[in-house]
Structures are given as C-alpha cells and as structure tokens.
Amino acid sequence: MVKNSVISVIFQKEKKGSVEFQVFNFTNKIRRLTSHLELHKKDYLSQRGLKKILGKRQRLLAYLAKKNRVRYKELINQLDIRETKTR
C-alpha cells in the first residue's frame, strides 16, 4: 500500500514539520472526509472543513513546487494526487 511506504520514508527522516509530512497528513484527512461525505451528503460542516484542508494542501504544494520541483514531483507521485494547475 502506498500509505505504508510513504509513512516509513517520512518517519525515517523524523521531520514531522516538513512540507511533505504536512501534505501527507492533509491527504489522509481529505481521503477520510471524502469517504465520510459519500455516506453523509448533507454534512455541510464537514464539507466546509474539507474545502479548508484542500486549500491548505494546495498552498503547501504550490510552495513546494516553487522551492523544489523534484521533491514536489516525487511527492505527488507517491501520494497519487493530481498536479496543481499553473497559471
């Protein structure tokens, strides 16, 4: 599973404040909230929380893409998320 391999790599580095670790945590929260919202379609507070977390992850990914493009590409491939649109 992708989750276990990413966890082992991140915990080996012991950088819990790193951008990669934060994006990883946000991705897990997003996946949990998405599965919750599939069951509870009218849970508007959870929808709002999901949008906030998506925005935070998007900002962190934009920061990482600007600072280190190679780490950004590796991270989005490991987490199996789409690349952000550039303007």
Curated annotation (Swiss-Prot):
Family per record: Belongs to the universal ribosomal protein uS15 family.
Coiled coil feature spans: none
This protein's record includes keyword Amino-acid biosynthesis: no
SMART domains xref list: Ribosomal_S15
Subcellular localization, as worded in the UniProt entry: Plastid, Chloroplast
GO biological process terms, semicolon-separated: translation
GO cellular component: chloroplast; ribonucleoprotein complex; ribosome
PROSITE patterns (UniProt xref): RIBOSOMAL_S15 (PS00362)
Classification via Pfam families: Ribosomal_S15
UniProt-recorded Gene Ontology molecular function terms: structural constituent of ribosome
Assembly and oligomerization: Part of the 30S ribosomal subunit.
Domain of life from the UniProt record: Eukaryota
Keywords (A to Z) from UniProt: Chloroplast, Plastid, Ribonucleoprotein, Ribosomal protein
NCBIfam families: S15_bact
Protein name, as recorded: Small ribosomal subunit protein uS15c
Gene this protein is translated from: rps15
InterPro entries, per the entry: Ribosomal_uS15, Ribosomal_uS15_bac-type, uS15_NS1_RNA-bd_sf
